[in-house]
């Protein structure tokens, strides 16, 4: 993992950049974009993916063994886990926007006989895994409350909504003629450090409740492309695009550090989604329209890619 390098002045960010990294909405619309990618791009460019690609995207294999039969699987996370807008929705998901074909559902479906408890919710921060979440006038209990002594597997993925500054920036920059605030390096570094610290605390709380459970931190996919050119769905370029990519990578590094420090497994979705960021020929991240997924969130193919990596990790 490369360290967060100096960023040539403040991280001045525009609307598309912030939406892609962490749109941080708390209105349940799914625009909370847990921004980020699953690892440092430079380190993982040669990594292999567990997903076999088809013309429709990655395939999710089924597991015919009894290794995971009767297991209880708890999924915790934000909208990148819940998958708002990826139809059909879970009947009880409400404003959290959980999909019946998000990666936790696909993983549970691949392991016949397992029980899924999906408490992921749009807008969730890492703090919401341990404390209650306020969303659209409703209060949701701490996600960790779903973990009990009989839980066998826990996946968790948060951090993209932890930067309160991103929510402020996205909200203000969306207004016509508004001046976008800036996020300085110290704020970014402190926020990334908190992501790691808070995720370590969550993993510890999970282990207290279910000492025997397998805990996996699921990294974010590649959202921002490498290079210096944006596109219609990400209309920034040059230095600004580079800063977005750097934050994309560093957020995931923070997730990976937490997994390593707490002795949990890390699922590298960043490597699995190489070549499928925004502006690519075959993006697995939705653009600005609410089509097939919430804006700037994983498309069904992105959910399948994450599921394939989780399945591979559990079978490893």
Locations of the language-model features?
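Short amphipathic alpha-helices and their capping/turn segments at secondary-structure boundaries
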Residues: 57-72, 136-155, 200-214, 311
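Sec-dependent bacterial lipoprotein signal peptides
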Residues: 1-22
């Amino acid at each position: 993992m490369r360290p967060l390098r100096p960023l040539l002045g403040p991280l001045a960010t525009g609307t598309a950049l912030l939406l892609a990294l962490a749109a941080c909405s708390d209105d349940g619309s799914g625009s909370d974009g847990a921004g980020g990618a699953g690892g440092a791009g430079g380190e993982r460019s040669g990594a292999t993916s567990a997903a076999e690609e088809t013309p429709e995207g990655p395939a999710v294999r089924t597991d015919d063994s009894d290794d995971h039969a009767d297991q209880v699987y708890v999924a915790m996370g934000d909208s990148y886990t819940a998958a708002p807008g990826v139809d059909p929705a879970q009947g009880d998901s409400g404003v959290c926007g959980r999909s019946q074909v998000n990666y936790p559902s696909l993983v549970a479906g691949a392991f016949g006989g397992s029980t899924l408890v999906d408490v992921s919710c749009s807008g969730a921060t890492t703090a919401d895994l341990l404390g209650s979440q306020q969303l659209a006038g409703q209060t949701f209990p701490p996600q960790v409350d779903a973990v009990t002594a009989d839980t066998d597997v826990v996946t968790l993925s948060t951090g993209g909504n932890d930067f309160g500054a991103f929510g402020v920036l996205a909200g203000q920059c969306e207004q016509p003629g508004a001046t976008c605030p800036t996020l300085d390096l110290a704020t970014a570094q402190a926020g990334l450090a908190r992501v790691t610290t808070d995720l370590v605390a969550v993993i510890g709380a999970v282990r207290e409740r279910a000492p025997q459970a397998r805990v996996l931190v699921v990294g974010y996919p590649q959202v921002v492309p490498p290079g210096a050119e944006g596109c219609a769905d990400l209309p920034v370029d040059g230095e600004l695009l580079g800063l977005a990519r750097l934050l994309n990578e560093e957020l995931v590094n923070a997730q990976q550090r937490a997994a390593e420090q707490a002795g949990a497994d890390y699922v590298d979705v960043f490597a699995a989604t190489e070549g499928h960021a925004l502006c690519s020929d075959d993006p697995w991240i939705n653009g600005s329209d609410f089509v097939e997924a919430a804006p700037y969130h994983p498309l069904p193919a992105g959910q399948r890619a994450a599921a394939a990596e989780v399945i591979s990790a559990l079978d490893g």
